[in-house]
Amino acid sequence: MVVEEEAIPVKDAVRGACEMLGYDVYQVANEGKMVCVVSADEADAALAAMKANKYGVDAAIIGEVCKKPEDRGPRVSLRTGFGALRIMDMLVGEQLPRIC
């Protein structure tokens, strides 16, 4: 799977806070978000359905599943703004959500 970094909707305040604190924006706890894996044939319809809801206004297609595992290996890769690929590693340790 290849995820396009520039396609992931991240609010400026969140990105700025992560940069100041040295956090990886893709590894911090995040409530109220969803990732869906949808057939390419249905992607536009699924996106339109999500955007039709007030909670889905920032919904976006952020990547694609590669046809052959050998194309990218068994991992999720992130294509950076510079076009380079890097592995999106699994979180190490505990992800602590905000305590309400």
Annotate each language-model stretch with its function.
Residues 32-38:
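Short cationic amphipathic helices and targeting signals
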Residues 45-55:
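Short amphipathic alpha-helices in soluble, non-transmembrane regions
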Residues 1-30:
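Active-site-proximal betaalpha loop/short-helix elements
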Residues 38-44:
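Helix N-cap motif at beta-to-alpha junctions
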Residues 27-28, 44, 68-71:
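Compositionally biased, intrinsically disordered low-complexity regions
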Residues 21-32, 81-90:
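A polyampholytic, Gly/Pro-enriched intrinsically disordered region
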Residues 8-12, 34, 66-69:
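Short gly/pro/ser/thr-enriched loop/turn and capping motifs at secondary-structure boundaries
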Residues 53-100:
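Acidic, Ser/Thr/Pro-rich beta/coil linker or hinge segments at domain junctions
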